[in-house]
Structures are given as C-alpha cells and as structure tokens.
C-alpha cells in the first residue's frame, strides 16, 4: 500500500528479533522493492550472530540480483562492530562492489563501528539520527555537524586537512 502511495523505499527492522524469520522477512522486503523498482532501507540493530547473518544474507541477495545494486541502505548495522578487521575488509569489499550504503548514528559506547574502515574500502557511509528526539538514546540532537564532529573525534587523526574531510558525513 505504501509503495502504491509513492514511497521511495521499503523498510524493515531487525528481521530475526522482530519478525522471527530472517530470510522470509528479508526476501519479502526485497521482493516488494523489486516489484516497485524502489530502494531498501533496513534498520538493523541486532548485534548477535543473527545480525551478522542478516548482513551476509542481504549482501548475497544483492550480489545475486543485479536490479538491487545501489539500492540497499543498512541503517545502524551494529553487527559490523562484532567482526574482526579481516572480516570487515572482506565484507566491505563486497558491499562496495554492490554499492551498498551504511547509514550510521556514529554510536559511542561498547560498540566501536568500523566506519572509517568501511569508507576506506569504498563503502558509502552516511549519517543520520532516528529523530530529533532520539528514542534510542538520550544524546540525540538531530545535528549532522555534531555527527561529523563525533566521527572526527573517533576516527580521524587531527589535522586541518583530515578534519575537513569529516564534513562528508554531514553533507
């Protein structure tokens, strides 16, 4: 119904925890996107092995379905913070080839997202907030410059050139 009303993306949320059927949930989401020639934006908060399995399944689906290339955004993707450097490199190469985007809130805390590593491997990394009143975190301001600042503090060696490069995240 939303697609017929003009939505540009079909979305989803934590296919294993919320839906209890990861493959069925993702297959349905991708099929709707294919039926309407639209993009996919899934909010994946799962950090368990189920989150890694969901990321791998989505990448494999895009690899097998050329019409989905450049049309998948994985928001949050916290499962990537559970991978080692070599695993991130391998997955990032596949994601870059398929033009898969990672949208991050640049979280701080126990999870350290490999955002710089993903970007260095050619993955498009963008930022956002869940809303101005962030229901997931009391620290949400809805300020993209604040996200670029946080990214710079976490991932960039401080010099003028490198700091100016952090603005990609806010623009």
Model-derived regions: residue spans:
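Histidine/acidic residue-rich metal-binding segments in metalloenzymes
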Residues: 2-73, 79-100, 110-127
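Electropositive phosphate-/nucleotide-binding environments in soluble metabolic enzymes
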Residues: 23, 52, 85, 89, ...
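His/Asp/Glu-enriched, well-ordered alpha-helical/loop segment
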Residues: 60-72, 116-171
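Structured catalytic/translocation cores of nucleotide/phosphate-coupled proteins
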Residues: 101-102, 171
